[in-house]
Amino acid sequence: MTVTTGRPGRGERRDGGEGPGGEEPPAVAAKIAELLLRHAAEALPKGTSQGTFRIDWAGPVDTELPDERAVQAACGLQHVHGRATGGPVPLAVDYASVVAGVLAALGATAVGVGRARGLRLREARTSVAQGALLAISQYLAAATAREGGEVEPPVPEVGDSGGYLGLATLVSLDGHRIEIETLDPEAWREFWTRLAVPPALSGRGWLPFQQRFATAVCPLPEVLRQAARRHALAELREAAYDTGVSLLVVSSDPLSTVNPAPWRLTPGPGQGQDTATGVEPWGFGPPAARPPGEPLLPLAGLRVVESTRRVQGPLAGHVLGMLGAEVVRIEPPGGDPMRWLPPLAGDCSARFLALNAGKRVVEADLTTARGRAAARELACDADVFLHNWAPGKAARHGLDAADLLPARPALVHAWASGFGDTFGDRPTPVGTDYLAQVYTGLAAAVRPAGEPPAPSLMTLTDMLGGLVSAQAVVTALARRAATGRGSGVESSLVSAGALIPRPARRVEWAALDRPLPTADGHLSLGPRARRNPEAVHRVLAGGGDTRSRTTEDWRERLAGAGLTATPVLTDLAGLARDPAFKAAVAPPDPAAPYARPHSPWTFA
């Protein structure tokens, strides 16, 4: 395995030293990619080839991005993460770098699969900026939908307890911070009824609670927060247990209590004839030819069948499609209800399209024997079957790996779960993003010391979990290319969240770690500026209050002192109009009336 981080001329050096702006190459991204490729190699026969990867900060984005903080500022992560707390603020972890690291490993493993199929590929290239843009793709689509783009949520206020009212985190009478989750409106109503909140009042909180996945803000009515503060943790736990609501205590410890492997691969049966192909063993055929001018992608000609919902599973299928696979999506009769959630891009939800555009849809009612038989037939004619159902549901449907692999030994069966088997025999919480952030310590790690711990309402583990699931799938495809046999692979939101490096104690921030407010926005200081507060203060002292001058004015003044700074993007729709992002973001057009990031890879 060969690793290259950066490229000369874009603030990177191949010798690992600092670039011209004093910035370091994206070492966290490279470390994550190396970790995942080592884990993949453990599942592959000795000598199996994987491709190489190259990562830099900016990729096709035509602006200077010297570090993680600059990428988060320029690509919208600070904006989306900060929606719930009153304004743009960095994630206190290297989230964009981790996403880029997974993309690099995924691309390199896909290169190996492509080579096994006769493609002349060597290297996958990606960047931290492209990882960040993929991470905000749903929010970008919603902001740019042609049929009335999403209105930015109002800036949340600070509540009586000192916490922002845009977060979903509640505080108990005895001072514990808690996160609750349910996808059932009846369970929601019953939980609050147990806390003496009338249904007419609790119902007002249901919509913002459910929409927080899409909007990254949760303006719950103050009456609900007050009701929680009147009850001790034990009472809240009892109410949650009795009503089927999941509840976890938000710890101030940033370290994960569990550290599962990124994914688990279980080899399929080692002998027997594949009933779909009639041959044994079974591997790959060469990809079908593409029209002149279209790049031949590593997974071209392979078929993925998915039965997924929300973010994690659909994203896994989406990126496999970006790698060239044909993706077939099983939806209930009448279509996935998420298709009609506003804002619409044409006749479909912009957020839904951000993860599902280009997939062929087959409708099947999996609650019926006929629907399950149809799904089985699709799976047994595919290379990959992917789902993110609740634990035990695949077995009840007769669509588990143990059910499908005997009939289709070449199949890769992928389960993307919330918590995997980390809870053992104990009741498992609802497998959603925010509870996974709490369980893995991310709820503490994403915010600096001095701030109350709370999950980011940006869907961090959902996005990362989808990418890790896709990496597990491509690893299993690489194994199949070498052995002719399929596998079952399992990954989870927890296994993805545990990938994000964080210190044993929450990070301490100085004033300059936060974006500086200006007359027309915010400015995020570069690494050299943050390391030299005296130099920054000399510039600021000569210019008055930071709000007295524009972002560009301050950036020029800082540049005159040899200090870099990045304007903080707070208008996602602006990405599609910014010439610097022309090669990274596709603007709305008649065929796709919403903005979306281009593929995060180029292959050589």
Where are these regions (language model features)?
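A short, aliphatic-rich alpha-helical micro-motif
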Residues: 356, 372, 376-380, 429
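Long, low-complexity hydrophobic alpha-helices enriched in A/L/V/I and glycine
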Residues: 361-365, 378, 459-460
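Glycine/threonine-rich flexible loop motifs
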Residues: 372, 389-400, 424
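Acyl-CoA thioester-binding alpha/beta core of soluble enzymes
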Residues: 1-69, 73-335, 376, 405-422, ...
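Core active-site phosphate/anionic-ligand binding loop and the adjoining beta-turn-alpha structural block
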Residues: 444, 448-469, 474
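Short, well-ordered alpha-helix to beta-strand connector turns
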Residues: 67, 74, 324, 358-359, ...
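Flexible glycine/proline-rich, aromatic-decorated loop/lid segments
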Residues: 429-447
